[in-house]
Amino acid sequence: LRAEGYDVPRLPLVVVSRSADLPPTLAGAPRGRILMATVATSDGLAAAREALGEENVLVLGEDEIDLARLKSTLAERGWEEQLCEGGPSLFADLLAAGVVDELCWTVVPRLTGGDAVRMATGAEVDVALRPALLLEQDGTLLGRWLVQGAG
């Protein structure tokens, strides 16, 4: 979101940030379109509440965001279907919290080198997946994988 400079989304968006740092491109979003999930000890908590409104800032832990509570809080607001497009640290934390039920993964027919990190880094996780859908076109693979045992 931050790195790619996305504009204000049409659908509700939840920014998950221990620092409560709101990307500048989202600062002018209509009230209720952006929620912030953060922690009580965040230095940016007051600024996030000012920018988004008190009711749109979810404090879900003292120092770490309770991701299971985040998922249930969003479901209580009627947001049953949730899509996460975070980085590898957030993804690992979501896996460790047991709140991921599927993975959509695209593989293109190209090898590159460099210092890239894994898909999930940080929390140690070992999650069994089973394929639900695999499509191929021009060598590109589109996959939808379900977490075994997920709800």
What are these regions (language model features)?
Residues L1-G151:
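Enzymes that bind and transform nitrogen-containing heteroaromatic metabolites
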